[in-house]
Amino acid sequence: MRAAPFAAAAMLLLAAAVPARADAVADIARQLDTHSVVQIGELHRSLQIHTFLQQMLRDPRFVCRVDDVAVEFGNSRLQKLADAYTSGGALSETQIASMYRETSVPLTWNTPVYRAVYDTVRDINAKHLCPHRVRLVLADAPLDWSKVGTAKDLEPFADRDTAMADTMEREVIARHHHALLITGEFHAEKKTNDEADGLRTAQTIERRHPGALFSIVTVPSPAAAEALHMGPAPSFKAARGSDIEHVSFAMTKPGWTASQPPAPKSFTIGEVVDGILYVGGDSSLFPSPQIYLDPVYAKELRRRAAIIRAMTGQDFVAVVDDLVKEGRDQDALANPPPVPH
């Protein structure tokens, strides 16, 4: 419950943002005329991107054209909880958090912008914004951490891209639905240099169903947005047949500058994605570290981090320890000991 003020603050920031220009929302919605799925690849924890996503989700011109909002930040094994929650059911905070915490991404989804998507879909349905109920589809691998004790146990769930593509196949495409798919930018790229390591979610969907997916990534650099003639934020451009189609995809990466030369074999924007979105920079939002003061949760995070380290070499154990320490420091400042008389 300690994190609630931070989540509320995040929602106030989202609500106070400048409304999205009508053409950006309308132009993205128009892609549903010819595609079943619009995928937006976000930069994790980006306040600007999620401000735009919230505005788009609450705009009937877009959200009422989709049947589903599918998200990377949710465990597909817990789909029944998502269905209950977004239909107005009463779930405990533990049940709600389990949907995004019970994944193989140990920390990122604690950022309030992700929970906000869950709450927005619930609110859309409660207010009957659309003639039909919008379903929240949890797209990530059906991992059960209670049955994972070693790296070998985790390996079957390592290919998250295929897992998300399979979920989209089962829950959206096979049902002839239209959907918004929200993932990290990595998963939205249709052409990469590392296909030997496995296909991205967008690549798999595109190969199974050519033309079904319209993928979008954001341009975080204001300098790149200016060079690409994006116009004031938020602004959107489709790649095919436009002035950005044959421009280096490197311009969509954080930190791009006008003096940066393109890589010798860099792909073009039109080769990698179908459109780009500029939302006015990229500032990150983080949850209160006090959420890690729950000793049971912190212990379980350390256990999961050790298993992930054994499988991938990525080490989150020290990060968890640092977050717990930071949480204690904040707690001490917020609750100083009484001054003796």
What are these regions, as identified by a protein language model?
Residues 1-7:
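Bacterial N-terminal signal peptides that target proteins for export
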Residues 7-16:
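Bacterial N-terminal signal peptides
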Residues 20-341:
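Compositional signal for N-terminal targeting/processing segments
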